[in-house]
Amino acid sequence: MAEIICDGVHIHPSMVRAAFKMMGADRMILISDSMRATGMPDGQYTLGGLDVKVVGNHATLVSDGALAGSVTNLADCLRTVVKKMEIPLETAIACATINPAKSLGIEDTYGSIAPGKKANLSLIHI
């Protein structure tokens, strides 16, 4: 399995498409790598004792401008992977649900909606 941050900042869309092609969608897991400033307005925040500047969906270290993490939630990553990276919606949803459950060995209980499984539902607009 490969975990991939599809926020449009960490990895170029062409590289995401290439990773899906090389690995196969059943081995891809969408993650957000979101830091504590996720959902907050632009400004300066602290992450692990380091000063971080957030502008839009970019979080960079104040000290040297290096990428400091993501300020994008998983729903936004789903939108980005479908709209900008041209991954089919059904595939993207599997990469955020059943694939992580399989990676953790809990797919019999989580990761999809079926009788006997625990239902975790989110309603999002893509």
Residue ranges and their predicted role:
Residues 124-126:
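Conserved small/polar residues in nucleotide/adenosyl-binding loops
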